[in-house]
Amino acid sequence: KVDGIIGVTFSDVEEYLDDTLAFVSIERRFSKDIPCVSGDNYLGGRMAAENLVRRGATNLLLVQTIMSVDNEVRKRRLGFEGYCEENEIPYASITFSEKQVPSVYSSFSARSLIGSVLQAHMNNQMTENGRPNGIFAGTDHLAVVIQEELEQMGLRVPEDVQLVGYDGLRWMNTGQPFVSSIYQDTGMIAKTSVDCLMRLMNGEAVEDIVDLPIVFQDGGTTLPLPETDIKEKQGIMLPIREGEDRR
């Protein structure tokens, strides 16, 4: 018998949940009595919209897939839409269920669905605000698929359409980011989850939601900031100039 468990979003662990076992969840909400550790998804959604707008996008589109279980990832949409509404930025949202898009790579029907819905928006068939010129994808994997679909339509990224993903993933062979993205530190999430679990096992109180910092990561699918806006603000990661040390 184990003394504690850390469960990730997709874990099927309901049968192990009881008052005698210390349990910490990553991203998924089970109940207010079970601590949930995650990057700050609400702020991440706002940050994605803000970065697109600051780089010149004037009409935004959110594309995401959601799971049937309650999880913190849903807050990305709330943050994105909240920023747009507060700043009167035209936007539209596309949400696919996990049944519609079980995998953005291996499912031909899912890929076809993403492409057809995206094309309808880019052809102004599903939005009254005109063609979007800034897209926030709920994950980096989804952003890669969207970039490929846009290029098949003859649209350039980022010249015609800017694109921001979420997670901050990098290609294994080059170490370069998939796309411009909202980066969350998975190492910090893991360490914080272990710390929360140890505190629970020692009888200490732990917050029900632990939101960790996130930052914008330039990956080449967004335009540079305007000269008048080249300054560091919360959530903006600027390129490191030659000879500059950020440590």
Model regions: which residues?
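Alpha-helical recognition/docking segments in bacterial nutrient-uptake
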Residues: 1-50, 123, 129-130, 247
